Amino acid sequence: MNYLLPLFSVLLGYGIALFLKPKSKTKLKLLLAFSGSFLLSLTVMHLLPEVYESHNTNIGLFIMAGILFQIILEFFSKGAEHGHVHGHETMSHIPWLLFVSLCIHAFLEGFPVSHHHNLALGIAIHHLPIAIILTMFFINAQLDKKAIFFFMITFAVMTPLGTILSDYLPILNNYYNEITAVVIGILFHISSTIIFES
């Protein structure tokens, strides 16, 4: 049931932005900063010690690969993973590069959740302000409401999908430490960026 927290979090953020239309950017930034700090503490206190217990000498390389991978994803998403969206132009269609990079990011975040149920809460707290900010951005860009719903529901499903795949594909368990190290790199980059930008 914990793996559904990120899904409900995105849907809650979508609903808040759609119906309540929050105006205070300061409160959103504070929520974003809290989510980044919470994610960083979960990563350092839970994920990092576990991957280093495996005594795999290449774990650091996988963490660096995760950081590099996130930098590449941000090139396409323009930093939307950490609430960084710009622009007031009108959109007639879904920004596909943003969509694909956010879905890959959310999907990979789901892998360690099956072994660390408290990480689901951290990801949910991280996804809530992102969902609010993205939905408000799309509404302001006058993107079609069906397209916004499709974008947000797909984004919401990605993290639980990553968790389910890691549970039901035993071959992935052979590479659990390596995959988790890549996710640690991704989470390090995102949480530190959120903290420094807030």
Which positions does each model-derived feature cover?
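Intrinsically disordered, metal-sensing/regulatory segments
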Residues: 1-198
